[in-house]
Curated annotation (Swiss-Prot):
The keyword Cytoplasm applies. Coiled coil: none annotated. Substrate binds at residues 35, 77, 115, 156. Pathway: Cofactor biosynthesis; ubiquinone biosynthesis. One of its GO terms (biological process) is ubiquinone biosynthetic process. InterPro entries: Chorismate--pyruvate_lyase, Chorismate_lyase_/UTRA_dom_sf. It is an enzyme of class 4 (lyase). Monomer. This is Chorismate pyruvate-lyase. It comes from Salmonella arizonae (strain ATCC BAA-731 / CDC346-86 / RSK2980). It catalyses: chorismate = 4-hydroxybenzoate + pyruvate. GO terms for cellular component: cytosol.
Amino acid sequence: MSHPALTQLRALRYFDAIPALEPHLRDWLLLEDSMTKRFEQQGKRVSVTLIREAFVGQSEVEEASGLLPSEARYWLREILLCADGEPWLAGRTVVPESTLCGPEQVLQHLGRTPLGRYLFTSSTLTRDFIEIGRDATLWGRRSRLRLSGKPLLLTELFLPASPLY
């Protein structure tokens, strides 16, 4: 199963450098903290609609080429992050199989738990970069994060109902 928002997410084109942005957009797109937490600060109940969680081969995560280690399998998680039931963000997480050892194995068992609830409680979380992307009408971003030095790639597309707009 897929979702049209995930097709748009995969179509994002990334800027080579951070573009000039209105302060409001910049505040959302370059947020270093948890997007889940930011949505909750809007006074909303945040929930996850799980679209897909599975191991996939390299051909299904081509956008990660050059950003993650080359491996035979990756854990792929695709979700909609909803605020009071309304989709605000489409998310796609690509995790190399080698990252899934030790405590990071929990990434395979998040189910309907927002990724941010796990990531941003870890004292071992670091972020290598944030890249800003855009399709015809929507903004997005991707980040390479590390847990205990082990990488994962998180891509987020802000949907029309999101307070980013």
